[in-house]
């Protein structure tokens, strides 16, 4: 639209507009623009050096953090082994505790049964003692009766004589004597019962003493079981404390991993290294040219970061996941930066193509209207257009790096002699550009890993 408006304005105007002074002013403006570009290039070199230093510091921090993560992983493995051993011991203690509880229940049942038998025996003993007292009282009464019988008067002599005579004439005298002795030797049933009860009492007393001894031993075993149970409960409490400590250590390891992934990964490497002042809108012409120069640099092949020390090699799956996430984020960030550079180049290309069309149309109109101008002026204008097109094609070819072709002042022939300041300024511009390009190449050779991650 602007080109059409300008063409319409030039069609409406009939007076000549082309002047060599305007051309010289444009060249001087271009020289000033180149000087500003050089200043900006120095600033970019300083920022790039700062980025190199920050990247080296971040690499050292990452190596230190990887060592810490490895140490934490080893500690976690040791704690896991300790926890496994504690779990095994806890299971064994639980099994022994269950066995002891079962034994204590059985012993309590035995104690109850023994107490019941003791009570029964005590009742039997009381009953037998009462019977013994009754028998004693009855025996005492019989003894009194015998004493009374002995106190009776003796039989008369005549009666004794008769008895003696009868005994002499008795045929079965020995049998009678045996019967008398057997009757005297036979005990009464009360006495037999008394002796039987005495024997039972002695047996019961012996059983009672045995039961008391058993009761004392069972009580001692019960106390030992209670002590072991309390010790097992204390050990279980210690295992709970160990488990809580294990959970705390696992939480600390997870926090360290999150801090490692959030604070010092290579995911946001390009965003941290490249300042935000470089990515501004395209309205500023010098900034757009600088971005074109910066993005047209040769893109080095991506290589993952290699660590030389074997101690920092992460053998577990967590380290592999971190490396994979890091590579994916680097690839995504490189694609985003490349897309941004492509969009900037496309915008520069469109604006340059529009300006080129306008310039060619104006040149054609000037050639048609100003036939009186010399052939040299026309030739200089064509050479300028060729040089500008060459510069744009070199800026678009970003794979081989941005290397502007120096415009020799001898090739530009004008009707009037060009000022020497213009020539010196352009020579200074191109020499500085070559020098900065060489310095950038040297820095890339010094830091190949940084160049691989910065793009």
Swiss-Prot record:
Annotated TM spans? none
- Organism of derivation: Mus musculus
> Compositional bias (Polar residues) spans?
132-142
Q: In which tissues is it expressed?
A: Expressed in brain and testis (at protein level). Expressed in the cerebellum, cerebral cortex, heart, lung, spleen, ovary, kidney and testis.
InterPro entries associated with the record: CDR2 (IPR026079)
Segments for region (Disordered): 132-152, 395-419
Q: Which UniProt keywords apply?
A: Coiled coil, Phosphoprotein
Q: Which family does it belong to?
A: Belongs to the CDR2 family.
On this chain, the residues bearing Phosphoserine are 310
Indicate what this protein is called per its UniProt record. Cerebellar degeneration-related protein 2
Q: Does the keyword Lipid biosynthesis apply?
A: no
Q: Where is the composition biased (Low complexity)?
A: 403-419
Which GO cellular component term is one of those annotated? cytoplasm
* Any coiled-coil regions, as ranges: 37-141, 191-264
């Amino acid at each position: 639209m602007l080109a059409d408006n300008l063409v319409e304005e030039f069609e409406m105007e009939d007076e000549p507009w082309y002047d060599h002074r305007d051309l010289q002013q444009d060249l001087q403006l271009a020289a000033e623009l180149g000087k500003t570009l050089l200043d900006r290039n120095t600033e970019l070199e300083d920022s790039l050096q700062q980025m190199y230093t920050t990247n080296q510091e971040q690499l050292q921090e990452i190596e230190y953090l990887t060592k810490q993560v490895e140490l934490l992983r080893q500690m976690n493995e040791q704690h896991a082994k300790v926890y496994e051993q504690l779990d095994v011991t806890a299971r064994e203690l639980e099994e022994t505790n269950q066995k002891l509880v079962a034994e204590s229940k059985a012993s309590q049942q035995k104690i109850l049964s023994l107490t019941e038998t003791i009570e029964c025996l005590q009742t039997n003993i009381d009953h037998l003692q009462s019977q013994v007292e009754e028998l004693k009282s009855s025996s005492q009464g019989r003894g009194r009766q015998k004493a009374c019988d002995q106190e009776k008067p003796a039989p008369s002599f005549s009666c004794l004589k008769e008895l003696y005579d009868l005994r002499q004439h008795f045929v079965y005298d020995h049998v009678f004597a045996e019967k008398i002795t057997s009757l005297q030797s036979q005990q009464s049933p009360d006495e037999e019962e008394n002796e039987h009860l005495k024997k039972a009492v002695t047996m019961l007393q012996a059983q009672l003493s045995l039961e008391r001894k058993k009761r004392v031993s069972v009580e001692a075993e019960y106390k030992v079981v209670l002590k072991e149970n309390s010790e097992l409960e204390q050990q279980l409490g210690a295992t709970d404390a160990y488990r809580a400590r294990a959970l705390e250590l696992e939480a600390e390891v997870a926090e360290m991993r999150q801090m490692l992934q959030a604070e010092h990964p290579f995911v946001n490497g390009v965003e941290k290294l490249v300042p935000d002042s470089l990515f501004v809108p395209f309205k500023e012409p010098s900034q757009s040219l600088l971005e074109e120069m910066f993005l047209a640099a040769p893109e080095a092949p991506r290589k993952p970061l290699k660590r030389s020390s074997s101690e920092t090699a992460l053998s577990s799956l967590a380290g592999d996941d971190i490396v994979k996430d890091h590579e994916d984020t680097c690839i995504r960030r490189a694609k985003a930066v490349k897309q941004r550079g492509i969009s900037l180049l496309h915008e520069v290309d469109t604006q340059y193509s529009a300006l080129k069309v306008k310039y060619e149309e104006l040149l054609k109109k000037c050639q048609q209207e100003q036939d009186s101008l010399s052939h040299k002026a026309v030739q200089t204008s064509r050479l300028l257009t060729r040089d500008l097109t060459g510069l744009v094609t070199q800026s678009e070819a970003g794979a081989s790096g941005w290397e502007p072709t120096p415009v020799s002042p001898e090739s530009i022939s004008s009707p009037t002699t060009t000022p020497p300041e213009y020539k010196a300024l352009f020579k200074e511009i191109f020499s500085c550009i070559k020098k900065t390009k060489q310095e950038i190449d040297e820095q890339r050779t010094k830091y190949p890993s940084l160049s691989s991650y910065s793009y």
